[in-house]
């Protein structure tokens, strides 16, 4: 919508400028011819010349109206021609660029894209590798940072009771095969005499009854 209006305005200005230049030139030429005409008439009517013969009429001098018309035409034509020429020169000089939101947004987009590409293409920073002496004297902490230590339930218990429980529960070694076999032999040895004594007691009671 704005582009057709701009084209119409520039076309109208160029047409008006052309008309002013042409009309000023025509009026100036007409005034110059009028000036030359009455100047020639004044030259023919100068006193001191010989009187013409009686059969030829004496030419009359130019009227004051013709002089005023010639002066007005010369002045107006020169003014119009000067304005038209100055306007043409001013129009031919390129002015400052007009603000265009489309071009401005496009320039900003290209600017941001170029700046991001330049930042991505930058060389990485060079890290100084420490020497052996620096590494020994200033050890570098490796690994992730340790989380803050929070008190647990075990830490909240009194240390005295925990030590007492540990002292009352001796650490027994795990049973071996030899210890298990010895325990079984001892149990079998204890049960065998009692069984024989009970059997002999039953035999004696049976004999006494008979």
Swiss-Prot record:
Membrane topology of the entry: Multi-pass membrane protein
Disulfide bond residue pairs: none
Localization terms from the record: Membrane
Keywords (A to Z) from UniProt: Membrane, Transmembrane, Transmembrane helix
Membrane-spanning segments: 18-38, 69-89
Record flagged with keyword Transmembrane: yes
The protein's name: Transmembrane protein 61
Species of provenance: Homo sapiens (Human)
Protein encoded by which gene: TMEM61
């Amino acid at each position: 919508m704005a582009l057709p209006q701009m084209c119409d305005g520039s076309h109208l200005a160029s047409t008006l400028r052309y008309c002013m230049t042409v009309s000023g030139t025509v009026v100036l030429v007409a005034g110059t011819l009028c000036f030359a005409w009455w100047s020639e008439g004044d030259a023919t009517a100068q006193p001191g010349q010989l009187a013409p013969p009686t059969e030829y009429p004496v030419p009359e001098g130019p009227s004051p109206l013709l002089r005023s018309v010639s002066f007005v035409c010369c002045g107006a034509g020169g003014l119009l021609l000067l304005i038209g020429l100055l306007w043409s020169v001013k129009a031919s000089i390129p002015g400052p660029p007009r603000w265009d939101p489309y071009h401005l947004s496009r320039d900003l987009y290209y600017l941001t894209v170029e700046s991001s590409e330049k930042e991505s293409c930058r060389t990485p920073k060079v890290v100084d590798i420490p020497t052996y002496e620096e590494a020994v004297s200033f050890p570098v902490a490796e690994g992730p940072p340790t989380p803050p230590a929070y008190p647990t339930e075990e830490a909240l218990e009194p240390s005295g009771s925990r030590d007492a429980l540990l002292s009352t529960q001796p650490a027994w070694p795990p049973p071996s095969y030899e210890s298990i076999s010895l325990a079984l032999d001892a149990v079998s040895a204890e049960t065998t005499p009692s069984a024989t004594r009970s059997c002999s007691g039953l035999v004696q009671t049976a004999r006494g009854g008979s």
